[in-house]
């Protein structure tokens, strides 16, 4: 089992933690990671857009002028795509973009993403982070102590902490997630992966 340092919010190392190799030390499968990211982005799409074809736009049944003799270009309908307020060629219709990956693939992708953070030395374990007020300045102070100033960081907590979650919303480069909402896209998107010690245990309980 790999050992990584455990820090407090002052940035001081206070111990070490052993990480489960079956989660944090698996071979990186880039194909599986790609599948997971594509599925995540596809599942975020609403697919509620809709436009009308020339057959669906109201009006345009009468020929605007006779075929020959006017000197103008021939036209059959004022709802042709070339006309203002005309129909759309190959109009988009509501559709479901969601991609359902097998559970084994999802789990493997998450393990690969976590393992990549360990191998790149981008995983930081915190012993605890208790907040009892909304204070973005405090979050910035802790991140500075950890050497993460002006860096993209994902903070993973074991359970809901409204003070911490809302305090990080004002920082564009930082996002806070509960273990239950952990996903491959966010793990890969953010350069640094900050996880609380209790959250590590929870991840190992769920995915080991």
Curated annotation (Swiss-Prot):
<protein>
    <recommendedName>
        <fullName>Large ribosomal subunit protein uL4</fullName>
    </recommendedName>
</protein>
<dbReference type="InterPro" id="IPR023574">
    <property type="entry name" value="Ribosomal_uL4_dom_sf"/>
</dbReference>
<keyword id="KW-0699">rRNA-binding</keyword>
<comment type="function">
    <text>One of the primary rRNA binding proteins, this protein initially binds near the 5'-end of the 23S rRNA. It is important during the early stages of 50S assembly. It makes multiple contacts with different domains of the 23S rRNA in the assembled 50S subunit and ribosome.</text>
</comment>
<dbReference type="GO" id="GO:1990904">
    <property type="term" value="C:ribonucleoprotein complex"/>
</dbReference>
<dbReference type="Pfam" id="PF00573">
    <property type="entry name" value="Ribosomal_L4"/>
</dbReference>
<dbReference type="InterPro" id="IPR013005">
    <property type="entry name" value="Ribosomal_uL4-like"/>
</dbReference>
<comment type="subunit">
    <text>Part of the 50S ribosomal subunit.</text>
</comment>
<dbReference type="GO" id="GO:0019843">
    <property type="term" value="F:rRNA binding"/>
</dbReference>
<comment type="function">
    <text>Forms part of the polypeptide exit tunnel.</text>
</comment>
<dbReference type="GO" id="GO:0003735">
    <property type="term" value="F:structural constituent of ribosome"/>
</dbReference>
<keyword id="KW-0689">Ribosomal protein</keyword>
<feature type="compositionally biased region" description="Basic residues">
    <location>
        <begin position="60"/>
        <end position="71"/>
    </location>
</feature>
<dbReference type="GO" id="GO:0006412">
    <property type="term" value="P:translation"/>
</dbReference>
<dbReference type="GO" id="GO:0005840">
    <property type="term" value="C:ribosome"/>
</dbReference>
<feature type="region of interest" description="Disordered">
    <location>
        <begin position="58"/>
        <end position="77"/>
    </location>
</feature>
<keyword id="KW-0687">Ribonucleoprotein</keyword>
<keyword id="KW-0694">RNA-binding</keyword>
<dbReference type="InterPro" id="IPR002136">
    <property type="entry name" value="Ribosomal_uL4"/>
</dbReference>
<comment type="similarity">
    <text>Belongs to the universal ribosomal protein uL4 family.</text>
</comment>
